Amino acid sequence: MANQAATAPEAAKASRTPTLALAGLSTAVLLASLGTSISNVALPTLAQTFDATFQQVQWIVLAYLLAITTLVVSVGRLGDMVGKRRLLISGLVVFTTASVACGLAENLSSLIAARVIQGLGAAIMMVMGIALVAEALPKERTGSAMGLLGTMSAVGTALGPTLGGALISSFGWPFIYFINAPLGLMAIGLLYHSLPKDIRSPLSARSSFDFRGTLLLAAMLATYSLAMTSGGSNFDFVSLGLLAASAAFLGIFVWTETKVSSPLINPAVFRTPGLSVGFLMSAMVTTVVMATLVVGPFYLSQALGLDTAQVGLVMSCGPLVAALSGIPAGKFVDRYGADNVLMAGHVTAAAGCVGMASAPLYLGIAGYVAPLAIITAGYAVFQAANNTVIMSGVSPDRKGVISGMLNLSRNLGLITGASAMGALFILGKSLTAATSGAAVIASNGMQLTFWVATVLILASVGLARRARTNLPNHGPDRV
């Protein structure tokens, strides 16, 4: 944990207008999250506009997600070097400009290219948002602020389809991107006037940027992400080849990082139990949450017989609960301590998974919504606590890269969950006799998926308890 001397620079950098700073940071996180979800509803319209297939227009979404996933660690390191405030404002400028370019795109290729640039800006906004909460706000408000950022992320996810549909029907598809411009300009103004100036380190103390490590990490993450998304739940030789390439890039990356004087990721990070366990728990719990998003629609339609509109309405309960849970979760962290709340989040999510796996079909929608709400609330509590534990134990000059790794662990959990949990659902269905009926088959797939999800949560609990035992001060050592 930090000692008093170590925290002095952070206290000196705290914003004099923390409320405005938090408003700007929250808007940045909201925009990045909105950018992920608002395009989905436009895909049919865009396919018709550009005379493209679904496989072609889905790259409008994938390009954005891949840009974020491959760049989050690199932009975190860059923020530590050039200044987090400076980089965040630059990221907002990039995101806002790229959003306008998306709306002006005259063909699919131009739109996808603009989405890649927009994803770069979003990666900066996500990473620097978390890093600056832990640095620019008073320590006693960190938990609440982390909870608020979680809420804004959930609001962006939930709001995207509804807002996107309204904008498309009223003004046309370009306005799902143009809407980012005024919000982006507002966030830039708030952050420019509220965040403290970056404290520039002496020139001799600044590290050079690890371009080789950055390229290797990006290649590893890109090939892994493509392997997990290109084949869906069915792995083929292309997916296996991409996984092999990803493993090769990972090996070269690890070897390279031990040889350079200023590595992108300091190998000491993985020797710090509190950090490595925190990243792993984040990936594991997010994998479980992704199961509700991937498997849920199939269960609702195949087992409960809901139509598309009804499925969408039921699925919106998850983001709604997450939005309502984020701020209270942060306050619990500030009041009861991150370690205790972390365990409570695990227990809550595990209880929801057990409920989802054991709910009988005759309970209908209620048998799905109630466990979904419990899982989502548990995740919100877990996320606020885990983010606080990780970021409060990191020295100021490493907050950017650690925030990037935290975002990366979450994204990898989402990507892995989409493929692995979908495969489990299909496996569960295949183990059921075809004569059982569609509802029973889908229900059995759901049960297998969430019993495995329960095991994942319990494994994460074991990691948390082990880390707690190894760290008497209940937090990662500063790195």
Please state what every model-predicted region is.
Residues T70, I124, A219-A222, A291, ...:
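Residue-level signal for the membrane-embedded core of alpha-helical transmembrane segments
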Residues Q56, S109-I117, G172-I179, S207-D210, ...:
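Interfacial loop-to-helix junctions that mark the boundaries of transmembrane helices
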Residues P138-K139, P196-S204, L226-S239:
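Alpha-helical transmembrane bundle and helix-membrane interface signal
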Residues P18-L34, S39-V41, F54, L185, ...:
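12-transmembrane solute porter fold
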Residues A2-S194, S325-N340, A344-A350, V354-L361, ...:
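Transmembrane-helix bundle of Major Facilitator Superfamily
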Residues A12-R16, E140, I188-A218, T258-P273, ...:
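Flexible interhelical linker loops that connect adjacent transmembrane helices
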Residues A181-R200, A218-S230, A245-V260, S460-R468:
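C-terminal membrane-cytosol helix-exit motif in multi-pass small-molecule transporters
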